[in-house]
């Protein structure tokens, strides 16, 4: 059967606690007038997840996941939020997981049951000269060298997605998710960046070398129709079977 894990993305600005902002307010003028505590945010997010599960007839949810690009300056507030959310999720018989970006591996692990290691966004998307901004293990290897001693159970997520990136006079304008996201002017350049199967398998092998348990569960992001069609079934078998093949 299919298991659904609700995932909530939270922007890092929500946890910039020094300004006492309201993390979920959409009205910028209201952000300094009503401070919301990490406990209150945890309550609201869990209640919202439960409401959406019920409205969409999604039962037997065993895990919820938080995705946030937290930094050293927001760690305390973010970890406090996770602490409360983990307690509340446990009361509902659910685990709490969180995404772990490569640059976060050198920091204290978040207080969750397990982490999802995001094996992508390794390069600088804003540089036209960067040919592999999504996944290049030349950039990733320095981050994963201490995975064997990382104290949080991890699963790995590998990229299938691609980017269309708009540059103007050699300078980054933005990632084009739709044709009308940005005006395209004469002389602009649109470049497509996407990981090849050889890049993905190199990442899989690198993770195996550091800690094979991480690949006991493999996640591919994201599985829309176009991305799935990029590779054939034999390629996917290589990913999920963790096979090394010198020919790819």
What are these regions (language model features)?
Residues 1-117:
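Chitinase-like catalytic core of GlcNAc-active glycosidases
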Residues 12-15, 71-73, 122-124, 163, ...:
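Short acidic, S/G/P-rich loop/turn micro-motifs used as interaction or catalytic elements
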Residues 36-39, 131-138, 194-198:
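Conserved phosphate-coordination/catalytic loops
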Residues 42-53, 79-86, 137-145, 201-208, ...:
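Generic structural signal for well-ordered alpha-helices
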Residues 157, 161-163, 168-248:
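Substrate-binding cleft of secreted/luminal carbohydrate-active enzymes
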């Amino acid at each position: 059967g299919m298991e659904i894990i609700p995932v909530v993305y939270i922007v890092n600005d929500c946890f910039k606690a020094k300004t006492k902002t309201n993390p979920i307010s959409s009205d910028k003028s209201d952000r300094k007038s009503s401070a919301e505590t990490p406990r209150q945010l945890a309550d609201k997010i869990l209640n919202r997840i439960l409401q959406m599960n019920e409205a969409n007839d999604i039962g037997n949810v065993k895990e919820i996941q938080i995705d946030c690009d937290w930094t050293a300056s927001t760690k305390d507030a973010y970890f406090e939020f996770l602490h409360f959310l983990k307690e509340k999720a446990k009361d509902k018989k659910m685990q709490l997981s969180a995404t772990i970006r490569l640059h976060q591996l050198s920091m204290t692990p978040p207080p969750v049951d397990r982490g999802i290691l995001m094996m992508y966004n390794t390069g600088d998307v804003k540089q036209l000269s960067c040919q592999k901004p999504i996944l290049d293990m030349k950039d990733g290897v320095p981050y994963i060298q201490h995975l064997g001693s990382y104290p949080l159970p991890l699963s790995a997520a590998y990229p299938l997605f691609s980017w269309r990136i708009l540059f103007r006079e050699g300078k980054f304008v933005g990632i084009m998710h739709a044709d009308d996201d940005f005006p395209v002017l004469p002389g602009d350049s649109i470049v497509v960046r996407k990981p090849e199967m050889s890049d993905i398998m190199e990442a899989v092998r690198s993770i195996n070398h550091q800690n094979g348990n991480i690949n006991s569960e493999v996640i591919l992001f994201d599985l829309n129709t176009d991305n799935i069609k990029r590779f054939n079934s034999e390629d996917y078998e290589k990913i999920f079977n963790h096979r090394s093949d010198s020919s790819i």
